[in-house]
Amino acid sequence: MHDANIRVAIAGAGGRMGRQLIQAALALEGVQLGAALEREGSSLLGSDAGELAGAGKTGVTVQSSLDAIKDDFDVFIDFTRPEGTLNHLAFCRQHGKGMVIGTTGFDEAGKQAIRDAAADIAIVFAANFSVGVNVMLKLLEKAAKVMGDYTDIEIIEAHHRHKVDAPSGTALAMGEAIAHALDKDLKDCAVYSREGHTGERVPGTIGFATVRAGDIVGEHTAMFADIGERLEITHKASSRMTFANGAVRSALWLSGKESGIFDMRDVLDLNNL
C-alpha cells in the first residue's frame, strides 16, 4: 500500500452513501481521496468529487473506468449492489488493492467469493460500519448467553423505502451473533415471515420483522422476551455519516495488512472485550 496517506476510491460516488463517504474521506487525517467511481453513462462523470459531495473542489474527478483509476488508490470502498461489488472485488484482487465492503444482500456464492479473495487481499466486510451497532452486536452475544435459552428472541428492523434487501444485513448479523452465542446455526432457527394460521411460536427460534417506510436511516431492536419481563437492545441511526466514518476508519486500519478478511469488531478491537 501507499507509504503516506491511505488513498481511497469511492464506488457509487453520486449516491447518498457515496457522497457521505467522500466527505468522511476528506475529513479523516491519514486518509486521502484518490478516486471516485460512477456507472458508465452517468451525468455525474467528469464532476469534481468534492464539489459533488458539497465539500469543495478536490481535483478528483468522477470516472467510470476502474482501469483509469487503478494507480490512484490503495483501498476501494464499496457500498453499492452485490453484482457491482463482485466485479470491483475481482479487479481489486487482480491488482492487489484492499477493500472495505459495506454492500449487503449477497447470496452465499457472493460471500464465498469475498472469502476467497481475502486469500490475496485485505478486506473489511461488515453488515454495518457504525461503532454503536458493533458494540450492540457484542452486547447481544453477552445477553444471549445469559438469557437466550429461556426467552423468545425477536429482531425488528426498519429502513427507508428505497432499501431493496430484507432483512437488512445488520439484522442478519444480529441473528448470527445471537445464534453463535447459543451454539446454533441461524439457518436452522431463523423465522423470516409469519402469515395466516402459524400455530404457537416454536421454542428456540429467532424471529425477524421488517419495516420499510419514509426516510428511516436504520433502526434495529433485539428483544429477549420472557413471562413478566423483556429486555430490548436497540440502535437507531439518524445519519449515514456514522456508517461513512466507520468505513473510512476501516480503510485506514487496513494499512499494512496484505490479506485476510476482517469486520468492524476487528477494527474496534471488540473481540478482546
Curated annotation (Swiss-Prot):
It is found in: Cytoplasm. It comes from the Bacteria. (S)-2,3,4,5-tetrahydrodipicolinate binds at H160, G169, T170. Pathway: Amino-acid biosynthesis; L-lysine biosynthesis via DAP pathway; (S)-tetrahydrodipicolinate from L-aspartate: step 4/4. NADP(+) binds at R39. One of its GO terms (biological process) is lysine biosynthetic process via diaminopimelate. The active site is at H159, K163. InterPro entries: DapB_C (IPR022663), DapB_N (IPR000846), DapB_N_CS (IPR022664), DHDPR_bac (IPR023940), NAD(P)-bd_dom_sf (IPR036291). Keywords: Amino-acid biosynthesis, Cytoplasm, Diaminopimelate biosynthesis, Lysine biosynthesis, NAD, NADP, Oxidoreductase. Pfam families: DapB_C, DapB_N. GO terms for molecular function: 4-hydroxy-tetrahydrodipicolinate reductase; NAD binding; NADP binding; oxidoreductase activity, acting on CH or CH2 groups, NAD or NADP as acceptor. One of its GO terms (cellular component) is cytosol. Its EC number is 1.17.1.8. Its main location: cytoplasm. NAD(+) binds at G12, A13, G14, G15, R16, M17, E38, G102, T103, T104, A126, A127, N128, F129. It catalyses: (S)-2,3,4,5-tetrahydrodipicolinate + NAD(+) + H2O = (2S,4S)-4-hydroxy-2,3,4,5-tetrahydrodipicolinate + NADH + H(+); (S)-2,3,4,5-tetrahydrodipicolinate + NADP(+) + H2O = (2S,4S)-4-hydroxy-2,3,4,5-tetrahydrodipicolinate + NADPH + H(+). Homotetramer. Catalyzes the conversion of 4-hydroxy-tetrahydrodipicolinate (HTPA) to tetrahydrodipicolinate. Belongs to the DapB family. NCBIfam families: dapB. HAMAP family: DapB. This is 4-hydroxy-tetrahydrodipicolinate reductase. It comes from Escherichia coli O127:H6 (strain E2348/69 / EPEC). The lineage of its organism: Bacteria, Pseudomonadati, Pseudomonadota, Gammaproteobacteria, Enterobacterales.
